[in-house]
């Protein structure tokens, strides 16, 4: 993990290895040498991981001066926040760019501002948008807003780098459910005036099943009469 609390797993593994060496050999000289080597590995792990992550984006993705500020392996994907001169913050999911901070205003406009201003929905549902960038705009124009996002790591990255936590905490008409959007639609009987879908492009199997006729039929079934689906 980069950009957060240190990953202690390597240190624990190193301690366990040193203990095994001592138990098997019973020689403090060997144990001391192994302990010193383990300390060096643990100390170098962070800088080497940072350099490697930066190199991937600078050379493979050809982003000059790229720096990985946040890298977490969630149960669903690798979540990374990358910063580059002249480009600001970018969100990558499994190495694929999901969001560029420069595009946030346009994204907020056509996905949230336009439909919500036209409708002023009493009940609005936001599927995805783990960075929560659409939440303040939608909440201000809706009676109540529910966000359904499956990956907590994306939410954490969003609050830390894209959408300040303080304004979100002040919202009294917004709630967040950590769940799969399709499963939520299938299990819930709630209906909404506006459903906004902000999901990654179907470039991997994990996202492809959210871009199907079945998924959009579920969305339609959860709309109130005259309701709108924004994609």
Q: Residue locations for each model-derived region?
A:
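Alpha-helical transmembrane segments of multi-pass membrane proteins
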Residues: 1-231
């Amino acid at each position: 993990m980069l950009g957060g609390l240190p990953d202690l797993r390597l240190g624990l593994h190193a301690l366990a290895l040193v203990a095994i060496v001592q138990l098997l050999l019973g020689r403090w000289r060997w144990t001391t040498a192994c302990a010193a080597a383990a300390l060096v590995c643990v100390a170098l792990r962070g800088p080497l991981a940072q350099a490697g992550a930066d190199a991937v984006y600078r050379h493979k993705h050809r982003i000059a001066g790229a720096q990985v500020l946040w890298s977490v392996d969630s149960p669903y994907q690798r979540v990374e926040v990358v910063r580059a001169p002249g480009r600001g913050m970018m969100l990558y999911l499994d190495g694929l760019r999901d969001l560029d901070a420069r595009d946030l205003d346009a994204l907020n406009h056509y996905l949230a501002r336009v439909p919500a201003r036209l409708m002023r929905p009493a009940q609005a549902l936001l599927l995805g948008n783990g960075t929560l960038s659409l939440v303040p705009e939608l909440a201000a124009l809706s009676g109540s807003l529910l966000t359904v996002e499956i990956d907590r790591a994306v939410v954490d990255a969003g609050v830390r780098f894209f959408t300040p936590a303080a304004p979100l905490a002040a919202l009294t008409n917004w709630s967040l459910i950590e769940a799969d959007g399709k499963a939520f639609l299938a299990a819930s009987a709630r209906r909404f005036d506006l459903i906004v879908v902000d999901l990654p492009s179907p470039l991997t199997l994990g996202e492809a099943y959210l871009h199907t006729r079945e998924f959009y039929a579920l969305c339609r079934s959860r709309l109130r009469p005259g309701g709108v689906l924004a994609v």
